[in-house]
Design a protein with these regions (language model features):
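Active-site acidic short loop of glycosyltransferases
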Residues: 72-74, 104, 133-134, 151
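N-terminal targeting signals for export/organelle localization
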Residues: 1-53, 189
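Conserved helix-turn-beta segment immediately C-terminal to the redox Cys motif
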Residues: 74-75, 92-112, 129, 176, ...
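Thiol-/selenol-based redox modules, centered on thioredoxin-like
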Residues: 9, 159-189
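Thiol-based oxidoreductase modules, predominantly thioredoxin-like and allied folds used
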Residues: 106-119, 134-142
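A short beta-strand-turn-helix
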Residues: 50, 55-76, 100
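Short, internal strand/loop/helix patches
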Residues: 125-163
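Conserved redox-active cysteine motifs that mediate thiol-disulfide chemistry
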Residues: 72, 80-97
Length: 189
């Protein structure tokens, strides 16, 4: 009986060795027989364009939704601001003057970072009304635009051409001359 167990053990070891050897021979051959995957260069599309301005949703004073893409076909001056921000307030007169001059040819999106605590729709709209500004103001109540543009400091202004590409960015308070030259560059395209 002991002899039979010994033969059985040897037989099991030989069978396991045969399975391992067979697997080592067959599996690499199967991998070699896999068809080669063909790849080709894909032409750059609008979606792959790194300069394409991220789309987002914001709301006007009446709660109507707007998207950046709604203004495709027209250059856009996109400005992120808040009423508690000193540099934001300091650049507003130049932005208003530019809006008065170019508002028929360039869309102005004055996006207020309305987080609901340090800035509310009420505080922002009260500031705008008190100063008599007439440019369009949009409220980023869900912070969607701020996230899309990775806004970590304000003010910041983006100059977006009619095809939706970001052509220039200015972080911090934008001087009137820089605002003017960037708008002129957008209109020249």
């Amino acid at each position: 009986m002991e002899k039979m167990y010994r033969i059985l053990k040897i037989l099991i070891v030989v069978l396991l060795a045969a399975v391992i050897i067979a697997a080592a021979v067959v599996l690499p051959r199967q991998a070699e027989e896999q068809p080669e995957v063909q790849t080709e260069a894909v032409p750059q599309t609008e979606a792959a364009n790194e300069n394409l301005a991220p789309n987002f949703r914001v709301y006007d004073m009446d709660g109507k939704e707007y998207k950046l893409s709604d203004f495709r076909g027209k250059p856009v001056v996109l400005n992120f601001w808040a009423s508690w921000c000193g540099p934001c307030k300091a650049e507003m007169p130049d932005l208003e003057a530019a809006y008065q001059t170019y508002g028929d040819r360039v869309e102005f999106m004055m996006v207020n970072l309305t987080d609901g605590s340090s800035e509310t729709v009420e505080s922002a709209s009260s500031f705008i009304a008190g100063e008599g500004y007439t440019f369009p103001v949009y409220y980023d109540t869900g912070m969607e635009a701020a996230v899309a543009y990775r806004i970590y400091a304000i003010p910041v202004t983006y100059f977006i051409d009619a095809s939706g590409e970001v052509r220039a960015t200015h972080e911090g308070m934008i001087p009137g001359e820089a605002l003017e030259s960037n708008i002129q560059a957008l209109l020249a395209q």
